[in-house]
Design a protein with these regions (language model features):
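Periplasmic alpha-helical coiled-coil/stalk elements that build and connect Gram-negative outer-membrane
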Residues: 435-565, 681, 685, 726-727
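A small-residue-enriched
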Residues: 270, 338-406, 519, 563-642, ...
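Acidic, low-complexity, intrinsically disordered peripheral segments
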Residues: 511-529, 733-780
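Short hydrophobic alpha-helices and adjacent helix-cap/hinge residues
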Residues: 20-325
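Bacterial Sec-pathway N-terminal export signals of envelope proteins
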Residues: 317-367, 521, 533-581, 586, ...
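Extended amphipathic coiled-coil alpha-helical segments
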Residues: 347-365, 413-459, 466-473, 490-499, ...
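Bacterial Sec-dependent N-terminal signal peptides
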Residues: 1-23
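A short glycine-centered flexible hinge/capping loop motif at secondary-structure junctions
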Residues: 303, 475-479, 710-714, 751
Length: 780
């Protein structure tokens, strides 16, 4: 037995040593490189290492990455060098492809990968034929299809085709450009470049651009080019991967899965070399799923309208809710602007002005009433002669009359009533102002919620597209039935509808804000995100506020203090108080006040301007009166019995007084209830913030595990759909938690009658000082 164990142990040791002795050096031959290409090569190395696993040791010497800079002679020499330095050669690029494809023999296993235009695919030497130590893995690319996509997307008539200068001689586009232009009815021109400056300098002559090249531009260089295109509002399309669209180009017909499929296919080819030691593999076309990818933000910036029909077949990058706005708002700017511009408030302000004028009108009863009059009379001559000068044939005269109230209880009462009603109207305006501010703040947060909802629905749509791909792959591999594919297609349709609705709801949210802010409804606005510990909320210490509410010992006195503050600040109570003052004054008027007399002063000055004709002179026995004379008098009046109206009016005033008192008590109870409700809602939202984070993290992890299990056939579609929907709900809950908390805080502030964001630091400190004083008084 000991002998058997010894032999077995030796066998294991030898086998392990033999496995570890298998080592392969892998080198790369490229047309050009930069940080982006180097990163992709690093990723390919990781994929190869993972696939080969323990079958052998693969080594990637840094000095065996060669670039020829589009020089075919250099590419040929570099290949010969790699033959002597490494065991496996991986090559990429149009020049490299041209050089290696012309060879008859390959001393070392050589893997060539890249793209080939569909119009030039033929059954040639390296397609579907075995060549010792050589395979080419190419994916078809259609310039015609890309240009047609670009034309349909933006409606262009002229397109500049951007390509590296060194690659022109080796790319079929030079041969195809004439036929493509005729077939697609486009004005096409080649725009060669060596660097970003060449591209930018050529943009002024372009209406749209198509990148055949550009893979060798770094991310920062591509962003520079994309910014220049956006500035000139030039749409762009590219053959390069999705990362360039993420950097600002408009669209591509590729997505990230193409690179992943390439790398996996190359890694499998390397594995076959390692395992078999002999490399016999047919060159082949790698068919990948094409998917139109559009940068939503770029489309919006250059003014390209996107059709809803694109949602089903298109992947969107960027943030559709991140728009180029004519105006941007944070919460404070919304609150301050709505005070100044809201039409409801402007209308309510007019009522205040009217009440002010009513008060002025009441006070004007004590101002003198002065009037002037003039007359011209013609009398019958015979009648005039008979009146002895009292009514001459022709008479012109005038008078000035003065009337001045000295004392009037009804006038005094009216002044008091109108003054109280003016103040009541002002409190009604304050109530309306608080309501409109709260409405605008709620609309602001609702817009943020709708924005977050749209982002999440977009992510969920992309997730469903990915799950549909997995279901299709499982169906093709025989791991699941077609029903899974059909189910995800149905889910995709529903998600598309949800996505469209969420986007339109976001636009409606902007419409609501525009209406409240008195902006044109179609004005493009955006709202800045709101976070508790940053921006305008940084100095707005909600954590201390939460601490008072979260502590059961502190909560009761703090809630009582908030109720007291609300009662002191409430414009509803002040409105009722002023109405009560007006009603009491009315009650007094129709009570004892009715026995007070009204005293007034009257005076008049008369003047005869002319007397002529018959009867214009007085007889000698009648003294001639002066042409001008005056009279002054004082009047006193007091109602004795006015059809019992005084008693009835007093009774009405008494009833109204009791009614106002009932309303006041009801409002006080309502305020107390509202404060307590708001405090509980804040506590709910505080816990919701913490729990929603855990909910989202857990749901995400469950989805990832379920997705992997479904991909491997370990779970069914129902479990995957449940996990996806659960994650969707978790995301919605998590993203909205902070906004709902802030809405709850603003609701409490509305009930208190004071918005802290509109206060100064001193005013907020004074609020805290009042609470400490209130608490101290309770403890005493």
């Amino acid at each position: 037995m000991r002998y058997f164990l010894t032999v077995s142990f030796c066998f294991v040791i030898c086998s392990t040593a033999f496995s570890q002795d298998k080592s392969y050096k892998i080198g790369f031959l490229l047309d050009k490189t930069n940080s982006k290409i180097a990163s992709l090569v690093d990723k390919l190395e990781e994929e190869i290492t993972a696939v080969v696993g323990e079958d052998a040791t693969v080594v990637f010497p840094d000095n065996n990455r060669y670039t020829n800079n589009f020089d075919p002679l250099l590419a040929k020499n570099q290949y010969e060098t790699l033959v002597n330095e490494v065991d496996i050669i991986i090559a990429y690029g149009v020049v490299t492809n041209e050089v290696l494809a012309k060879r008859d023999t390959y001393p070392k296993p050589t893997i060539l990968f890249g793209t080939v235009n569909e119009d030039f695919i033929e059954d040639g030497k390296h397609i579907n034929h075995e060549v010792d130590n050589f395979t080419s893995i190419v994916t078809p690319l259609s310039y015609r299809e890309d240009l047609e996509f670009l034309k349909n997307l933006v409606g262009c008539k002229q397109v500049g085709i951007l390509i590296e200068r060194g690659a022109i001689a080796y790319d079929p586009i030079s041969e195809m450009i004439t036929s493509l232009a005729a077939e697609l009815e486009l004005d096409l021109s080649l725009v060669p470049f060596d660097n970003t400056s060449d591209i930018i300098n050529a943009l002024d002559d372009q209406k749209a651009v198509y990148f055949i090249g550009g893979l060798y531009l770094t991310d920062s260089e591509m962003k520079t080019v994309a910014d220049a295109l956006i500035q000139r509002k030039i749409p762009s399309f590219t053959t390069s991967p999705i990362s360039d669209v993420e950097n600002g180009l408009l669209a591509t017909n590729n997505d990230q899965t193409q690179i992943d499929q390439f790398f996996r296919r190359i890694a499998l080819s390397v594995e076959s070399i390692v395992v078999d030691d002999v490399f016999h593999e047919s060159s082949s076309l790698l068919t990948v799923n094409k998917s139109l990818t559009i940068n939503f933000n770029t489309a919006q910036k250059i003014g390209i309208p996107l059709k809803y029909s694109l949602i089903a077949t298109t992947n969107f990058v960027g943030d559709a809710s991140d728009i180029v706005a004519d105006k941007e708002y944070d919460l404070v700017s919304v609150m301050t602007e709505v005070i100044a511009e809201n039409l409801t408030l402007k209308e309510a302000k007019q009522n205040v002005y009217i009440a002010e004028k009513d008060a002025e009108l009441a006070k004007s009863n004590y101002l003198p009433d002065v009037s002037a009059a003039a007359s011209a009379n013609y009398n019958d001559p015979e009648f005039a002669e008979a009146t002895n000068g009292q009514n001459p044939e022709v008479l012109t005269a005038g008078n000035i009359t003065l009337s001045q109230t000295i004392f009037s209880e009804s006038a005094n009462a009216n002044i008091g009533i109108q003054t109280a009603l003016q103040k009541a109207q002002m409190e009604d305006y304050n109530r309306e102002e608080l309501n409109v501010i709260f409405e605008s703040a709620t609309a602001y947060f609702n817009t943020l919620i709708l924005k977050a909802n749209y982002k999440i629905q977009s992510k969920n749509l992309n997730l469903t597209k990915r799950n549909l791909e997995i279901a299709s792959q499982n169906f093709e591999a025989g791991q699941s039935g077609k029903s899974d594919v059909l189910r995800f297609r149905s889910e995709l349709v529903q998600n598309m509808q949800d996505n469209i609705e969420s986007f339109n709801q976001l636009k409606q949210g902007y419409y609501v804000l525009n209406q409240l802010l008195n902006n044109p409804i179609d004005l493009i606005i955006d709202v800045n995100d709101a976070q508790l510990d940053s921006g305008i909320f940084e100095e707005y210490d909600y954590h201390e506020f939460n601490g008072l509410l979260n502590d059961p010992v502190e909560r009761k006195p703090f809630t009582d203090f908030l109720i007291e503050e609300a009662l002191n600040n409430s414009p509803e109570l002040k409105f009722l108080d002023y109405n009560l003052i007006a009603t009491e004054r009315s009650e007094k008027l129709f009570g004892p006040g009715r026995f007070l007399p009204t005293v007034a002063l009257q005076g008049q000055y008369n003047h005869v301007f002319s007397r002529s004709g018959a009867g214009s002179t007085f007889p000698v026995f009648i003294p001639t009166p002066p042409d001008g004379y005056y009279n002054v008098g004082v009047s006193l009046s007091m109602p004795i019995f006015n059809q019992n109206k005084q008693n009835i009016n007093k009774q009405i005033a008494t009833i109204q007084k009791e009614q106002i008192q009932f309303s006041t008590d009801n409002v006080k109870l309502q305020i107390e209830k509202n404060i307590n409700d708001a405090v509980l809602e804040i506590i709910n939202q505080v816990t919701n913030i913490e729990l929603s984070i855990v909910f989202e993290e857990t749901a995400k992890e469950v989805l990832e595990l379920t997705q992997t299990s479904y991909e491997n056939g370990a779970v069914n579609i129902i479990q995957l759909l449940d996990a996806q929907n659960n994650y969707l709900q978790a995301q919605l809950a998590s993203s909205n938690a902070t906004y709902n908390y802030l809405i709850a805080m603003l609701t409490l502030e509305r009930y208190i009658g004071n918005f802290f964001l509109l206060e100064s630091t001193d005013e907020r400190n004074a609020f805290l000082a009042r609470f400490l004083e209130f608490k101290a008084n309770i403890e005493d």
